[in-house]
């Protein structure tokens, strides 16, 4: 019988972080590096736990090389060929593989390709198993299969939005569970399927479930600005995956388009018409597109955006009195709000000029 849960679920836009007394004198005093030991692989991670999404307009080899300079992670999209992987490995800095994951679906072809790439590139340490609906039994079985084949690799898996499924994926072999259904800027699942979960509440609940098993969670989607990234960490996310904020740069995928003397880059969801026609030839007759395609202003080199995101996180830590990023979730108190910002002069803002690549 249908039922309604009456407890309100919250998104990033519904809250702000309350400022608290702080002993920090400067944002420069904040330490963003985290160190994790993963439950199943037993491997140790050290870095800044911001992650570029495994979309083909974001998770590129070029993005991985650029973000590695900041100790930021990249999940490489799954549509690179084995030969492209080998060419990248031949030219990449060895330490890039400390901040990089190979992504895979769960089909037989995906399994074959995953095995081939890992055989050719033994330096790979991370595997990202990515499906839109992480609640299927076939997905759980695939995680078990990968864990059995690669016991020392760290496995990211998702997406789900509820605690009981987080526990299921961790107990099946996942080290990091990706949390988020429908919050992304170019995702339309909530409109097409009517399914989803507000991202802040999803992260709060899933982090609680994962941490009880010594597992980890990655908030995936819904961050439209650096403040949202800080809120995700404050809600208990161990990693925060970003798509749209990393799109539109020199290192991003997507076609560069000129219109009326201005430059734009194409950005689209991986379940959009654009993505399915590009990678599969058409949209299967039994399904609907659950993503959209947009043109976003060209942003130049990604390093400027990285500085903006990390600066925002440092500022949030300073306001809440968290000297280390790991303290932010302990220091965070969220207040519900009816309005976040004063948008009086938004139509008159001077646009940022993209910084050229070096």
From Swiss-Prot:
Gene Ontology MF terms: GMP reductase activity; metal ion binding
CDD domains: IMPDH
Active-site residue list: 187, 189
Residues where K(+) binds: 182, 184, 187, 190
EC code: 1.7.1.7
One GO cellular component term: GMP reductase complex
PROSITE patterns reported in the protein's UniProt record: IMP_DH_GMP_RED
The reaction(s) this protein catalyses: IMP + NH4(+) + NADP(+) = GMP + NADPH + 2 H(+)
Binding site for GMP: 220-222, 243-244, 269-271, 287-291
Keywords, in A-Z order: Metal-binding, NADP, Oxidoreductase, Potassium, Purine metabolism
Family in the record: Belongs to the IMPDH/GMPR family. GuaC type 1 subfamily.
Subunit structure: Homotetramer.
Alphabetical list of NCBIfam families matching this protein: GMP_reduct_1, PRK05096.1
Function recorded in the entry: Catalyzes the irreversible NADPH-dependent deamination of GMP to IMP. It functions in the conversion of nucleobase, nucleoside and nucleotide derivatives of G to A nucleotides, and in maintaining the intracellular balance of A and G nucleotides.
Protein name, as recorded: GMP reductase
Organism: Caenorhabditis elegans
Gene: gmpr-1
């Amino acid at each position: 019988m249908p039922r309604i849960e009456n407890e309100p679920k919250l998104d990033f836009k519904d809250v702000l972080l309350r400022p608290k007394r702080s002993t920090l004198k400067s944002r420069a005093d904040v330490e963003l590096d985290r160190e994790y030991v993963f439950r199943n692989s037993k491997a140790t991670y050290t870095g800044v736990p911001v992650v570029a999404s495994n979309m083909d307009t974001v998770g590129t080899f070029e993005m991985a090389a650029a973000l590695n300079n900041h100790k930021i992670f990249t999940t490489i999209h799954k549509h690179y060929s084995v030969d492209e992987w080998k060419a990248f490995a031949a030219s990449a800095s060895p330490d890039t593989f400390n901040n990089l994951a190979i992504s895979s679906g769960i089909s037989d072809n995906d399994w074959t390709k995953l095995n081939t790439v890992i055989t050719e590139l033994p330096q790979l340490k991370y595997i990202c198993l990515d499906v839109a609906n992480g609640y299927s039994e076939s997905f759980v079985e695939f995680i078990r299969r990968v864990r059995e084949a690669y016991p020392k690799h760290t496995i990211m898996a998702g997406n789900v939005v509820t605690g009981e499924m987080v526990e299921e994926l961790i107990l099946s072999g996942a080290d990091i569970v990706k949390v988020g259904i429908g919050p992304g800027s170019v995702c339309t699942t909530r409109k097409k399927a009517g399914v989803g979960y507000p991202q802040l509440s999803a992260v709060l609940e899933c982090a609680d479930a994962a941490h009880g098993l010594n597992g980890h969670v990655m908030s995936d989607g819904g961050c439209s600005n650096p403040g949202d990234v800080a809120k995700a960490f404050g809600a208990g996310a161990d990693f925060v995956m970003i798509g749209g904020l990393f799109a539109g740069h020199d290192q991003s995928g997507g076609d560069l388009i000129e219109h009326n003397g201005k430059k734009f880059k194409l950005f689209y969801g991986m379940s959009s018409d654009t993505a399915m026609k590009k990678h599969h030839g058409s949209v299967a007759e039994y399904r609907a597109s659950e993503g959209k395609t947009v043109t976003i202003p060209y942003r130049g080199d990604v390093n400027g955006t990285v500085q903006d995101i990390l600066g925002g996180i440092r500022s949030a830590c300073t306001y809440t009195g968290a000297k280390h990023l790991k303290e932010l979730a302990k220091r965070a108190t969220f207040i519900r709000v009816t309005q976040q910002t004063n948008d009086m002069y938004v139509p008159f803002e001077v646009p940022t000029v993209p910084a050229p690549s070096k």
